[in-house]
Amino acid sequence: MWRGSSAGGSQGAAMEGTGGELGGQGNWGLEDAPGLLARASLPIMPAWPLPLASSALTLLLGALTSLFLWYCYRLGSQDMQALGTGSRAGAVGGRPGGCSEAGRPSPGRSGESGEGPRTEGLMSRRLRAYARRYSWAGMGRVRRAAQGGPSPGGGPGVLGIQRPGLLFLPDLPSAPFVPREAQRHDVELLESSFPAILRDFGAVSWDFSGTTPPPRGWSPPLAPGCYQLLLYQAGRCQPSNCRRCPGAYRALRGLRSFMSANTFGNAGFSVLLPGARLEGRCGPTNARVRCHLGLKIPPGCELVVGGEPQCWAEGHCLLVDDSFLYTVAHNGSPEDGPRVVFIVDLWHPNVAGAERQALDFVFAPDP
């Protein structure tokens, strides 16, 4: 141990004593420095007892965790409220203005966008809720659709004749009539089920005279001469109608592209009486394709979609993109009887699987 000293030893004696304080008297060396420094720092920063510091840190972390969980709960509650009120806010149907070809009423005038900015904001909130639960992967087109909303008037559609009322998914191939090969499996399944579906219609049919109320299961006419019996309405199964139409329900269960869990999805019988006409309408979205299976097609019936005329054929399917302006008419005589088709909403073949999942979440039917 190094000690301070002087030639006569008097300096060493002066350093000896009983005190150990820095600057006082006593024996000290290099090994005593840590203790001296610690004692010197006590008046500046008193050390907390270890148990007390640990308890304070635990309480702080607990408070931060509780605050984070509360924030997540509030955020999730707002999203679920938006999801719960979406379709009740007119998310799909728009304003009732006439009878669409199977399903909820289409907008009263072509291009009418229903809720406008309110619907656009609701869709964006739902999409963010979906992304938080799953992922944004593959959501480019859906995000653009949510940000842009439907096109009023002649916006992003083809030459202004494609005007979906609610959802316009960009970059989808567009044509008024879709080739059968695009949905070959579902088309062939429905056509092979034609006899069973026709029998089901005979079992639930009535005289359509208009002098008596429609029987159970049939919707009241939303336009003169237009009647519907739906097995699926806005993505919700109608159990009583499905039990009355087992052949049609079995065919629906075998389809691969049926929009069965989406408010854009409908399926059922559509009846048009002689003299009835539905003109200048557009469906709510270009993300679907409507499959028309002809059941009873008398002379004088016509379907014009996007300016292109077509006609149904009994036992055969016609694929229609009803986001284009369309007109349906029965110009036959009363003796010809009604025109009857079985209509099913299928996914557009170019909507990817991830996009379908997201749109099913965003446009989920009411519970």
UniProtKB/Swiss-Prot annotation:
Which keywords does UniProt give here?
Answer: Dioxygenase, Membrane, Oxidoreductase, Phosphoprotein, Signal-anchor, Transmembrane, Transmembrane helix
Q: Which GO terms describe its cellular component?
A: membrane
Outline which residue ranges sit on the Lumenal face.
Answer: 73-367
Where in the cell? Membrane
Family as reported in the entry's similarity comment: Belongs to the aspartyl/asparaginyl beta-hydroxylase family.
Positions of the UniProt region annotated as Disordered: 1-27, 88-122
RNA-binding is among the record's keywords: no
Membrane-traversing stretches: 50-72
Carrying Phosphoserine, the residues are 106
Q: Which segments sit on the Cytoplasmic face?
A: 1-49
Transmembrane is among the record's keywords:
yes
- Topology in membrane: Single-pass type II membrane protein
Q: Which GO terms describe its molecular function?
A: dioxygenase activity
Pfam families assigned to the protein according to its UniProt record, in alphabetical order: Asp_Arg_Hydrox (PF05118)
InterPro entries given in the database record: Asp/Arg/Pro-Hydrxlase, Asp/Asn_beta-hydroxylase, IPNS-like_sf
The record, for Gene3D superfamilies, names: B-lactam Antibiotic, Isopenicillin N Synthase, Chain
Name-wise, this protein is Aspartate beta-hydroxylase domain-containing protein 1
Q: What is its EC number?
A: 1.14.11.-
Q: Which domain of life is it from?
A: Eukaryota
Q: Which gene encodes it?
A: ASPHD1
Q: Which organism is it from?
A: Bos taurus
